[in-house]
Amino acid sequence: MKIINIGSERALEVIKAPQISEKATFLAEKVRQIIFYVSRDANKAEIKSAIEQIWKSQNIKVKSVQIINVKGKKKRFGRYIGQKSDWKKAFVSLKDDREIDFTDVRLFEDK
């Protein structure tokens, strides 16, 4: 995976939110993988760079990133059928058995 530098604004666009579910909690405890909702146009290198930049104060390093494109479900509204938007999620493995503190986000360092 190539190393790229992205700005802090793009980092916040790439990483939308962590996924909180039973499966995500199980993976975080057993396999040390964290699941994030990410932007649909993001690639693995951007996701890795964004996570390392957002949680730079915790010295987080990413070991690997796997991406899944999820199709939106069809929903029915009375007699009309609509479809939810497609989305993308990333499974991120961290180096050195670190854990991310989601409340500690520092993008701009004080000088």
Curated annotation (Swiss-Prot):
Gene3D superfamilies associated with the record: 3.30.70.330
GO molecular function: rRNA binding; structural constituent of ribosome
Pfam families, A to Z: Ribosomal_L23
Subunit structure: Part of the 50S ribosomal subunit. Contacts protein L29, and trigger factor when it is bound to the ribosome.
Function statement: One of the early assembly proteins it binds 23S rRNA. One of the proteins that surrounds the polypeptide exit tunnel on the outside of the ribosome. Forms the main docking site for trigger factor binding to the ribosome.
HAMAP family: Ribosomal_uL23_B (MF_01369_B)
Record's protein name: Large ribosomal subunit protein uL23
Organism: Nitrosomonas eutropha (strain DSM 101675 / C91 / Nm57)
Name of encoding gene: rplW
